[in-house]
Amino acid sequence: MTNRLLLRVSLSALPMLILFREAQAADPAFCRQYAKAALNQVRGGLSDPACAGGLQGSRWSTDFSVHYEWCLGISDAAAGGERDARTRYLRGCTGR
């Protein structure tokens, strides 16, 4: 009996978890703009010898789909935080 109750509770919570996940995911149009802006930042960093050496990891990928697909799975706020991290790095290495 308790196994059935546990199963019912688990199944009834599933739609709420799905809705919560969808509420956090970013909009595809937002993610296209995010990925374009990320690539502009990456290109800017690669073109500056003072910055290029520190461009490591997926944050600095030259592949549009890496940025776009990542963005689709996170909130707008998380995408903004990633953009801001790239901006801070670029300002630091260029001195601007």
Regions found by a protein language model. Give the residues of each.
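Bacterial N-terminal signal peptides that target proteins for export
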Residues: 1-10
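Extracytoplasmic/lumenal soluble domains of exported proteins with redox or metal-associated functions
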Residues: 2, 15-16
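Functionally constrained cores in energy, signaling, and assembly domains
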Residues: 8, 15, 82
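Intrinsic disorder/low-complexity segments in short proteins, especially the signal peptide
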Residues: 10-11, 22
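Compositionally biased regions
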Residues: 11-13, 62
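C-terminal segment of classical bacterial N-terminal signal peptides
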Residues: 16-22
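Post-signal/leader-peptide non-cytosolic segments of secretory proteins
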Residues: 25-96
